[in-house]
Amino acid sequence: PGPSAEDLEAPDDPGEDLLGLLTDPAWVYRQYDHQVLNNTLVAPGAGDAAVMRIKGTTKGIALTVDVNPLACYLDPYVGGALAVIEAARNISCVGATPLAITDCLNFGNPERPEVAYQLTEAIRGMADACRELELPVISGNVSLYNESQDTAIYPTPTVGMVGLIDNVDHKIGSGFVGEGDQIFLVGTESLESDVTSLGGSTYLSAIHGKINGGPRLDFALEKKVQKFIRDASSKGLISSAHDVSEGGLIVAIAESCVIGDIGAALNEDLSEIGSLDACLFAEAPARIVVSVSKTLSNEFESLALNSQI
């Protein structure tokens, strides 16, 4: 079962909870040289996927690696599917079209029935997601028997994905860009307000020490939202795009502020929201935080309306 209002106290200081969820992995990935041959246009950490140009053309390739082990632990099928879906969402967020995946399946001892179940269901979820997105699996490997003291790791079906941008002039980063740009939440008509939507979230695990509930999945909505982001990017309508994933909406917004070195003013009235922590920290899928120049906001909204977003 998922969390209930009785399980969780209202956050005393959402700002402190936000700081508890923000991390800085830069000390790891910045040890590596991303500029070999001077082809990197969006470095790791600057966008939801890295982007490299293809010299002599207008095209570029986008690369990302994704998985949420907690989601896979709670629901191996949905978690496996979401690993593919989130990778595609991240590829789309830089303006690229997903092309293919590779995978690395990391699990415990498959001789244990529960691990065999996790492995089978995660693969089934990944396969269904690949069929939905029409993506081939071009390579992969498996790492099993990952245990210590008879305790298996969380199921971790890691997905690497490559995508293509036809015109690298339309690439997008995750950071907010210009003062006065407008911020949109794409993929939903309302903010999360039900405490049960916190099920399977990083917030529930890291702040409250609870692991329950389960991740959600909507193939049709994901495909529609991702296509819209790619269309808007190709028309040059988007300044930045960052998907809502681990940590929820407020973490995605904060990360866009940090990456872009610019603040954000949010004027949404939350006084009547059912659950403030669900609004801020729920990880409902198919949501993307987008910033758009004021001069382009009407065209962006018109495209969203025509795309039934």
Go through each PLM region and give its residues.
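Glycine/proline-enriched, intrinsically flexible loops and inter-domain linkers
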Residues: 1-309
